[in-house]
């Protein structure tokens, strides 16, 4: 966030709009864009420091969102990122390229479910290749967090279809596994509001 000099003592000069590269990356159905911040250099050091800490607060809250969206998201992300940092094999193969696309989609969606459709995203690489990445990068991922990448379990983060149990069929982590709509209805119907003008939020700290 600060205007740092390079090894030669040359300070960064913001590029003009004509020379600025807005597109950072493009993969799957996504294009990643960045933007200039006009007036950034005119901010005081205190104002820049405030922006820094606001950004850090956002990063701290990010993991809450990941966990709320799906119970295995954080464990899966940790494994994928460890592979991405430590894999020393061929990074030009088709399967590695497929792995890169997958981890970028997971980053963008804050989890393994698509940010619009809520469908679980399928990897373009084989289970055997993923096993080789885990082994060669000394990464551990086992049990349900491993299996769910490749199987059809928890295929929808939020399932809004009619005629199904929307709570049971949704993988979102607001409720524990195997909780049904009937469980939710009974839970809330048993609660009372002592003062209707000051309603209590019973569900904030409960996964039933």
Model-derived features with residue positions:
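C-terminal motif of bacterial Sec signal peptides marking the signal peptidase cleavage site
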Residues: 2-5
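N-terminal helix-rich structural modules
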Residues: 11-208
């Amino acid at each position: 966030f600060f205007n740092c000099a390079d090894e030669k003592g040359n300070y960064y000069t913001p590029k003009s709009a004509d020379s600025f590269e807005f597109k950072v990356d493009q993969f799957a159905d996504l294009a990643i864009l960045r933007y200039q911040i006009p007036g950034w250099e005119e901010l005081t050091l205190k104002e820049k420091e405030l922006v820094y800490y606001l950004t850090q607060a956002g990063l701290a809250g990010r993991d809450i969102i990941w966990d709320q969206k799906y119970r295995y998201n954080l464990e899966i992300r940790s494994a994928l990122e460890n592979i991405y940092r430590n894999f020393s094999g061929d990074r030009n193969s088709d399967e590695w390229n497929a792995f890169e696309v997958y981890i970028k989609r997971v980053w963008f969606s804050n989890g393994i479910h698509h940010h619009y459709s809520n469908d679980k995203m399928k990897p373009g690489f084989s289970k055997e290749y993923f096993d080789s990445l885990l082994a060669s990068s000394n990464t551990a991922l086992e049990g349900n967090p491993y299996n769910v990448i490749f199987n059809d379990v928890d295929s929808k983060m939020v399932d809004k279809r009619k005629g199904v149990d929307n709570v049971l069929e949704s993988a979102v982590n607001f409720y524990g596994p195997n909780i049904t709509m009937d469980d939710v209805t009974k839970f809330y119907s048993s609660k009372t509001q002592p003062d209707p003008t000051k309603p209590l939020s019973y569900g904030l700290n409960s996964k039933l």
